[in-house]
């Protein structure tokens, strides 16, 4: 019975802490994204009538290129992190085989 109480308490504590951390992280990332794209204000102020202009198409293309570059960096970072985990697992397996 005590384990169920500990689980429920831990679950609720994890939910609260996760919500706080997620909220803070979300606001920081949203603020950073807003400061990195000053061209967004320009697009918003031009109105709907000029959405097909060459300048707006070029602006959208640059934004997409930037986002793709950011995604590639994140993918490379995760690949590196997972590579280190795989290396550690392989070392542990080899050590266990030699025992």
Curated annotation (Swiss-Prot):
It comes from the Bacteria. GO terms for cellular component: plasma membrane-derived thylakoid membrane. Its main location: membrane. The chain crosses the membrane at residues 10-30. The keyword Signal does not apply. Signal peptide: none annotated. Keywords: Coiled coil, Membrane, Thylakoid, Transmembrane, Transmembrane helix. It is found in: Cellular thylakoid membrane. InterPro entries: Ssl2009-like. The keyword Membrane applies. Residues 50-84 form a coiled coil. It is a single-pass membrane protein. This is Thylakoid membrane protein ssl2009.
């Amino acid at each position: 019975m005590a384990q169920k109480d500990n689980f429920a308490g831990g679950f609720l504590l994890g939910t609260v802490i996760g919500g706080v951390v997620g909220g803070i992280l979300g606001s920081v990332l949203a603020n950073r994204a807003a400061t990195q794209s000053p061209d967004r204000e320009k697009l918003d102020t031009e109105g709907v009538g000029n959405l097909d202009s060459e300048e707006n198409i070029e602006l959208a293309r640059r934004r997409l290129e930037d986002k793709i570059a950011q995604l590639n960096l994140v993918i490379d970072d995760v690949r590196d992190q997972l590579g280190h985990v795989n290396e550690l697992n392989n070392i542990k397996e080899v050590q266990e085989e030699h025992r």
